[in-house]
Amino acid sequence: MGGISVLFLMGVVPFVYIMYLIVLVFIILFLVISYTFDSISTMCISKNLNYNYKLRTWIPFYNKYILGKITNNKTLGLILGVLMFIIFCISVHIYINTEIGIVFFIILLILIVLSFVIDIIISHKIYKNVTSKYADILTVVNVLTLGLTRPIILFIIRNKYSKETK
């Protein structure tokens, strides 16, 4: 009887580990694709506004500041960039340490929600400047998909944002 349970556990544990790796690979793949769309759209929007940020839009946390600068709200962009850096540091800390402190996890969740709200506010300002009719609809779609469509929407409207729309 003990042999069957050992065989069962030997099959379940690798399955759970493989599922964990698959989910981790999909998350990393999504983050890379999202970052690429986000950087390209920020680069094109800043080029349309005659800003010289071609290479700076590819700096991971600085591009959030540039998005804030595009919407004439540097403070929100700076706060978002700092929040994203803190979220990254806490996530690495939680991943590296085997024992997760509940305090770090709660702080991480609060910071993720706060950065999501600030990201939605910045995106809504860009949507409102480009398509004032559809800005609310795009923001609702962005919120309902938990921000998954934000880089794609920004990528689609990147060439419509210029000095005239600002």
Q: Which residue stretches match the model-derived regions?
A:
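Membrane-interface extramembranous regions at the lipid-water interface
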Residues: 27-83, 118-166
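Membrane-helix interface segments in multi-pass membrane proteins
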Residues: 1-31, 81-118, 166
